[in-house]
Amino acid sequence: MTIAPAETSTTKQRILDAAERLFAEHGFDGVSLRQITAAAGVELALANYHFGPKTDLYIATIQRRADELNDARRRLFAALPPNPDVEGLIDAFARPFLDKSLHGGPGWKSYARLIAQTANAARWTRAVMTAQFDPVAELFIDGMRRALPAADPRDLYWGFHFLIGALTMIFAETGRIDTLSHGLCRDHDLAAIYARLVPFMAAGYRALANVKTGRDA
């Protein structure tokens, strides 16, 4: 099969766009490769040609935006002072996702839901989450070591675990907070959420760092 480079790029993007939307809506097991290629308007053989089996397409779908997200985070980390504060680190990690969700178009909305699913599925931990996101996660945790030098190292990892849980829930925009608050809070109001997220998580990190007794390993 001989395909021109420009056509190849366009075809791959169409497949990835369709996969991202359908995986986000139905999950990995709820959509077939045939359904994805039908939504993309391409032949099934082209998905196999460019990506291989559905598992590889799923990983490629995550990786496409992970690279962009991680690059933005690295730039913000690099701009921080040598001894950053807790708020600055949380902002550098979380803001790129906020900016993409607010201004990146519907694809980023689908991606947020997809990441929320992936982060909560053990089957993808090593192949996706570890491979795509751990290097930048370690940069964040290293920064926290400098910001909170007296903290128990375990708490730096637990704090990151809690932060990721909050981010995936927030940016997935499930509507849960809308229902729970009877409309007082809106999960699509990401700017309002973010204004509360950073001080909330920073206070949590500092509280963990200040706990000296009364906690088991």
Language-model regions: role of each:
Residues 12-17, 51-74, 78, 130:
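An amphipathic alpha-helix adjacent to DNA-recognition modules
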Residues 14, 22-56, 60-64:
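Helix-turn-helix
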Residues 74-111, 160:
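Hydrophobic alpha-helical connector segments
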